[in-house]
Design a protein with these regions (language model features):
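Bacterial N-terminal signal peptides that target proteins for export
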Residues: 2-14
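C-terminal motif of bacterial Sec signal peptides marking the signal peptidase cleavage site
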Residues: 22-25
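N-terminal secretory/targeting leader peptides
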Residues: 27-140, 152, 157-159, 163-376
Length: 376
């Protein structure tokens, strides 16, 4: 009996030992099998995804170009270096107004520009920059992110094979620099002016000869008399361009109350990113866009003071009521005509009009009422 008990203990111990050895061997096999998978995952994390971005702006262009750099820096930092975006300026790619085409074709994964530059390809893109007598920046951002604007922008750009995202706002722009004073509608007849977007179509109705010129060529065109007037941005950037040296009349705005730039992303390239990098890129673009708006406001305020102090020869003017009324009427007629011809145009116009009607009531009772009562 004692011997049987000893035998049973030996068998039990052996069984446990065999089981432990078997489990150990199995665990080792699982570890060996898992190792390549972990190595592959780690390798994927270490792979650096390098994209190229083409921008309309020249090398070192302030504010607009700075927003692109900020976005790229954020993507690299938030991804832990897994994704990098290399920026080509217009000085390199030589196609300042061809950004959409290059991103669509896959020459660049990303672009940064203003969507009204290709209104000739699709007039609906103008809505995502700005429209004359339209929303101001806070209203427009609210429309983009909470009022259906992003969905409408996606519908328009889907057929281009491109995703579009807000890329920075200039705020309310000035009406432009003029070689001569504008007092009547007759003064607009035959006037050669650089002004893009729907505003250019409005002024064409009033007799202005409208042209679109790349940013890097504006100063020379105005200085040489190729054009008589130009609209660029506002004090934040206009003083850097030197327009105050060659055109004495600086008019307040009507045409671009909230000009939004765009980040464009090749759809196939974006869809091919891992989800976490898609999210990082989206967040970086949104942050850079609103940061540019704050920077534009700051620089405009600082440079406006410089105009008053350093350039007393610059004469600030507002277009006479007669001209503003004619602009509004031409704008209304063109909008109605385009909406009747294009259902997509009408859908976006109806959306913006309804949202502005709602939001403007709050703007009037909040910002406008406060400013009206507190302006010195």
């Amino acid at each position: 009996m004692k011997k049987l008990t000893q035998t049973m203990k030996w068998l039990t111990g052996s069984a446990v030992l065999v089981s432990m050895l078997a489990l150990g061997a199995c665990g080792e096999q699982q570890q060996q099998a898992a190792a390549p998978q972990e190595e592959q995952a780690e390798q994927a994390q270490q792979e650096v995804i390098v994209w190229k971005l083409a921008q309309t702006w020249g090398t070192g262009f302030p504010i607009f170009g700075d927003a692109v750099i900020k976005m790229a820096d954020l993507v690299k930092a938030m991804s832990g270096g897994q994704m990098e975006i290399r920026i080509d300026s217009a000085n390199k790619h030589k196609a300042a107004l061809g950004i959409l085409d290059m991103v669509k074709a896959g020459q660049y994964e990303m672009g940064h520009s203003a969507s009204y530059y290709w209104k000739g390809k699709d007039p609906n893109t103008m809505f995502f920059s700005t429209m004359p007598f339209g929303m101001i920046a806070p209203e427009q951002y609210a429309w983009f992110y909470y009022g259906g604007g992003m969905d409408l922008m996606k519908k328009v750009y889907d057929k281009q094979g491109v995703y579009s995202f807000p890329g920075g706002n200039t705020g309310n722009q000035m009406g432009g620099w003029f070689a001569k004073e504008i007092n009547t509608l007759e003064d607009l007849q035959g006037l050669k002016m650089r002004i893009p977007g729907f505003a250019g179509e409005v002024l064409s109705q009033l007799g202005v000869v409208v042209t679109n010129i790349a940013p890097g060529e504006l100063y020379t065109a105005l200085e040489r008399g190729t054009i008589d007037a130009l609209e660029w941005v506002g004090p934040s950037l206009d003083l850097n361009m030197g327009f105050q040296k060659i055109a004495p009349y600086y008019y307040t705005g009507w045409h671009e109350p909230a000009t939004e730039l765009q980040f464009m992303v090749n759809k196939e390239a974006f869809d091919g990113l891992p989800p976490h990098l898609q999210e990082i890129l989206t967040v970086a673009m949104e942050f850079a866009a609103y940061d540019m708006y704050a920077r534009s406001y700051h620089d405009s305020a600082v440079n406006w003071a410089s105009i008053e102090q350093e350039y007393p020869e610059v004469r600030i003017r507002t277009f006479p009521p007669e001209i503003i009324a004619a602009m509004k009427e031409a704008n209304r007629e063109l909008l109605e005509e385009s909406a009747a011809a294009d259902p997509m145009f009408k859908e976006i116009l109806d959306s913006q009009t309804a949202y502005m009607k709602m939001a403007r009531k709050w703007t009037e009772i909040s910002d406008y009422a406060y400013l009206k009562d507190n302006l010195e």
